[in-house]
Amino acid sequence: MSLTLTVAGRRAAGAALTAALLVPLAACSSGDDTKKGTGGATASGSASAAPAADLTVLAAASLTDVFKTAGAAYEKAHPGTKVTFSFAGSQELVAQVSQGSPADVLVTADTKSMDKVKADTGTPAIIAKNRLVIATGEGNPHKVDDLKDLADTKLKVVLAAPEVPAGKYSKQILDAQKITVKPVSQEPNVRAVLSKVELGEADAGLVYKTDAESAKDKVDAVEIPDAQNAVAQYPAATLKDSENAEAAAAFVAWLSSPEGQKILQDAGFQKP
């Protein structure tokens, strides 16, 4: 696709891709070293003064549960505003932005993904951090205790694909410990890894701590020591092609506000 497409042309070209992944909030409710930014707005005051708008937020798959909660809270605090989410692996989100999919806000699970579309975004703001754990079946039937147990070839291990942030972090920590794992599959996002473990299709997998927490009735989480772990950072930014620039900036600012941070931290995310 030509890089000289007009904004309208870029939006038309990407509309079908985004539409297939959009998750209307109404149906759901009734490490890196990027500096903290503003996402295109100052964090003080802009969220409360936000104009009503229909916002489309492209968000990393690991934010699925918490963002549904956050979106409902934001809509309640901002009557007339509707927040619609499209959840996917960060690499898919970046592809959507590059292809001109119509959206207002982008939130990825690493800063490197955000950097790939820096020409299309405002200044990112780190809104949360996360860490990896080993997810196992309920009761940890295979007695997985630490990372080196994942090298057992009798164990069915599933990992996120190396193209996605969770896969990059997984490779980083396994390589650092000189542990060789032969996964039975590599999944397109971290939620797919979690699903494999939940369904018993895998004995163990590396997922974010918050993902394991969201499925604690179906999986156990084996903690990984900080010295062996990686810190995932979540940058949020407005998209320059947004037709709701002021409202988009206000939403990003709200994610860093006390109310937004409480929702994120209650779900197990760490302070930025």
Regions found by a protein language model. Name each.
Residues 91-122:
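Pocket-flanking alpha-helical
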Residues 2-7, 11, 16-63, 68-72, ...:
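Exported/periplasmic ABC-transporter solute-binding proteins
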Residues 80, 102-103, 202:
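Short, high-confidence coil segments that cap the C-terminus of an alpha-helix
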Residues 87:
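Conserved strand-loop elements at the edges of beta-sheets that form or border functional pockets
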Residues 75-84:
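Signal peptide-proximal N-terminal region
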